[in-house]
Amino acid sequence: MRKTLLEKKAYVKRTLSLFILIFCSIVTSQAQSKEITVMVSPDKADCLYTENEPCTFTIRVFKAQNELKDVTVDYELGPIEYPAEKKTNQPLKNGKLEVKGRMSVPGFLRCKVTAHVNGRDYSGLATVGYAPEKIKPVTDMPKDFKTYWDSTLDKARQTELNPTMVLLPERCTDKVNVYHVSFQNVRPGSRTYGILCIPKKEGKYPALLRVPGAGIRPYNGDVYTASQGAITLEIGIHGIPVTMTQSFYNNLFNGALKNYWQINNTDRDAFYYNRVIAGCIRAVDFLCSLEQFDNKTLGVAGSSQGGALSVITAALDKRVTFYAPLMPGMCDHLAYLEKRAGGWPHYLSQSTEVKEAVKNVCKYYDVVNFAKFLTVPGWFSWGYNDETCPPTSMQAAYNTITSPKELHIYPQDGHFWYDEQAEEWSNWIWKQLNIN
């Protein structure tokens, strides 16, 4: 049965409310809007320029949607994270200030503004791309990259899945059974947990693996997609049940798992993401073991950290038939070595002392290198104003992909997404699952 437009919109809203938790564990609670808006507008609507083409940013400040005239601003202009021009206390003449810039090489030019109004500071920014399709990654591939990961996964599979499935009656619907599941990943006793949703009606179904953004949180599972005729599995990556209260996860995030993305990042085998990545592949093993799986269609999707894990899983496991990353992290870690913004979690950022061991380990966990092994269709989307996963890093990874791919840019998007973007993402996933 085809979904109505209202059903689709309702699902998009549920999807947004579900994934907004990606950021809640990292970003402190704050007001969602402010009375003062700092508007930074490039002179081309698509925010795309050729090398050496001039760009004019127009800066305006609004209060209650009315332009303010007597305001001073500070601004920075230049490549992302490496501004070449900094000015302070610049007055807005007739309510605006024009700032001109250009880039002679492929990359992204950012104008970041702080306005001073009634003793308070307000910020805004705009970012434009200069021949982004020509951006090349800095991160190189170790000679043993492929053999290392083949060996790592072979070792992981020496441990039986030994899955557990606990029905959650309070979450089941008339169409879907919902389970809290777990399975072993890299060694006996080390487990991956998630929420599995299976249509109640007998039959064979496609499957969707949802991988998480950064943070620690409970999961609800993708019940709606399952109700339309697909198996869905939403996993956590931290080896703990995903049905506890948020306060339980907050204590872990502020305690033993604080900055987990840095744990053992000087040791290729002990690095935190080693088990995480193997766990994603074991999740595919688990889905393929289900009698309800059709053994034909299996996708993986996620945003930020989950966007990275989507690419990585699709690259490492040929049973994956499509992948859909939003604003993927973990791209082009080594870009900072050439004074260019690298991806989250910024292991080699300009403010960090570069350790040779970290640099070498990063190469084995860089989306840039996994992307070279992709063979199935992928759907990407991000914004140019993303300050967590800089577009330079994501574009560098995207440009290395030779298999079928789509890129949907929302220029003003930061490290979040618009309703339209989420709907476009979901519709593409449903099309691949043949359920729309």
Describe each model-derived feature in a short phrase:
Residues Q395-N436:
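C-terminal catalytic histidine-bearing segment of alpha/beta-hydrolase fold enzymes
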Residues N259-G299, S303:
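Gly/Ser-rich "nucleophile elbow"/oxyanion-hole loop immediately N-terminal to the catalytic nucleophile
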Residues L374, F380-W382:
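Short beta-strand/loop motif that positions the catalytic acidic residue
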Residues V376, P390-Y398:
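Short alpha-helix in the alpha/beta-hydrolase fold that links the catalytic acid
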Residues G307-V354, I409, W417-E420:
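Hydrolase active-site cap/lid region
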Residues K204-G213:
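Short beta-strand element of the alpha/beta-hydrolase
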Residues R217-A278, A335-G342:
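Cap/lid segment of the alpha/beta-hydrolase catalytic domain
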Residues D43, L161-K201:
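N-terminal cap/lid segment of alpha/beta-hydrolase-fold proteins
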